[in-house]
Regions:
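Generic recognition of flexible, low-complexity loop/linker segments
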Residues: 89, 229-232, 274, 305, ...
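Long, contiguous hydrophobic alpha-helical segments, chiefly transmembrane helices and signal peptides
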Residues: 95, 99-101, 120-122, 241-246, ...
């Protein structure tokens, strides 16, 4: 059975159901036994009839629908009942600047999630700005723009931004990604993009990442469970929100607020004051990674960077990969532990009003016997407790390169433990933001962007656009998802 042709059905009737909103409305209909939705905005239809659906336990949920009903309440939710008695829900949220939809499947034993058929269709002549590449690195590729009809089975890293023929702007992404695998977009060669999942199986072989140069062997994470979909889940299944941002101009687009509105609120035990937590202090930083050759990681050189940051009025210095080897690389060698060297640096920086952040990989890299990583819960607790005691203010955690279920949950555990120790976090080598910085205000940024770290050396594999084009596109594409760990020079 072709799942794409058997989409989630709410009604056997082709009768549209409208949800009221000030500017954006979602209309649901079941035309020909298939669930469709459309979006109206400012008297226009930027998203004409588009399919919804999921494939769970190898069954397209849209078949054999017995009934559906709209549930009472402030938020719109539809209950869908199958003839076999199975029940699931479609939730709809509407805002002045767009819409969001998601699926909920009640707990009923283990379930395997195979695929998703949620699509967003645009009028003919729509142009799209997007980044595309191997899925581990799709978030740091160069942006390009094309007519949407020319994109056929090509991966688009969310968010992708669209300019419709009538001048309306739209952006498509996902939000509130928690305990679920992340999604990408695929072009369908038919004026639409489809939410979908990328299989992890087969992307790790002989210490290399498929499609990537051998110089990136060290980026392969060996103790991640690199699994292929379907993902098996127990308990209630709640998908992330599928978000469509809408605006009549670019100013409205960059000021879109949907992601923050659908993100879960912070845990009051971890963040009693929410986003106003006193120890969370965003700022500008310097780091030595690109410019200092073999001397870049020494304690003395970092003190020089602290002096420079203080002189320039910058808030922090990031101590990158290699600091944990200081007992082997510093002139005094093993006379001091890595923590003693680090304490010397944090004390020096504190006297000058500069914070110190430290780097660590999320897990053990292939062929690197010095890595420890943060997968083990005990190691996470010990490492972060020691960082806090040493005076470190923030962590740069690197090398995720996937958004499977394990990795998404690992990032959340890292953020929780960091919050317990009053540590700020940036994620590097990671997927796009989905509102996680609203749920965890100590997450200041995620990379998921092609910065000037990719200009040469070991990063020269990333093909480069004209930087003037790339930088002017970013505020209207990648930055719509959330703050970025971006490297300018």
């Amino acid at each position: 059975m072709n799942c794409i042709n058997n989409l989630l059905v709410i009604s056997a009737l082709a009768l549209p159901l409208m949800v009221n909103a000030q500017k954006a409305t979602v209309g649901l209909s079941a035309d020909g036994g298939k669930l469709n939705y459309k979006v109206s905005y400012n008297g226009k239809t930027p998203v004409p009839a588009s399919p919804l659906g999921m494939k769970v336990d190898n069954i397209c949920l849209g078949t054999d629908i017995a009934s559906f009903s709209k549930n009472p309440g402030a938020e719109t939710s539809y209950t869908v009942k199958r003839k076999d008695g199975a029940v699931y829900y479609v939730d709809v949220r509407e805002f002045d600047d767009g819409v969001a939809l998601r699926y909920r499947i009640p707990a009923d034993g283990p379930k395997c999630i195979y695929s998703e058929q949620t699509a967003v269709t645009f009028p003919e002549g729509t142009r799209v700005w997007y980044a595309s590449g191997p899925f581990q690195y799709g978030w740091i590729q160069a942006y390009q723009d094309r007519d949407i009809s020319k994109i056929d089975n090509e991966l688009l890293a969310p968010p992708a931004t669209f300019l419709l023929p009538d001048g309306t702007y739209a952006a498509v992404t996902e939000a509130n990604l928690r305990n679920f695998h992340g999604a990408v977009l695929f072009g369908n060669n038919d004026n639409s993009v489809n939410f979908g999942y990328v299989e992890n199986k087969g992307h790790v072989e002989s210490g290399t990442i498929t499609g990537m140069p051998g110089s990136h062997v060290h980026d392969v994470v060996r103790d991640y469970p690199w699994i292929a979909y379907p993902d098996e889940k127990t308990g209630e299944i709640v998908t992330p929100w599928r978000v469509i941002m809408l605006a009549s101009d670019l100013d409205g687009l960059v000021n879109n607020t949907i992601i923050g509105k659908v993100a879960d609120a912070p845990d009051p035990e971890l963040f009693p004051n929410g986003k106003d937590t006193e120890w969370i202090k965003p700022g500008r930083s310097v780091f030595t990674w690109l410019t200092e050759g073999n001397n870049r990681l020494s304690v003395a050189n970092h003190k020089r960077y602290v002096d420079g940051a203080a002189e320039l009025g910058l808030q922090s210095v990031v101590v990158d990969d290699g600091w944990e080897l200081w007992p082997q690389t510093e002139p005094e060698g093993s006379a001091h532990t890595k923590w003693e060297y680090l304490k010397d640096l944090t004390d020096y920086a504190a006297q000058r009003g500069v914070d110190i952040w430290v780097w660590r990989p999320s897990s053990v890299r292939a062929g690197n016997k010095t890595d420890i990583g943060l997968v083990d819960a005990g190691e996470r607790r010990q490492f972060m407790k020691k960082c806090a005691e040493t005076g470190v203010k923030g962590l740069k955690i690197d090398f995720f390169h996937t958004e499977n279920l394990f990795t998404v949950n690992l990032m959340e555990e890292i953020l929780k433990e960091a919050a317990r120790n009053k540590l700020m976090v940036i994620f590097h080598g990671v997927n796009k933001p989905t509102g996680d910085n609203f749920t965890y205000p100590n997450l200041l940024a995620k990379e998921a962007v092609r910065g000037l770290e990719c200009v040469g050396g070991e990063n020269s594999w990333a093909p480069g656009p004209a930087w003037t084009y790339h930088n002017t596109v970013l505020p209207f594409t990648r930055w719509l998802a959330g703050p970025a760990d971006y490297t300018p020079l």
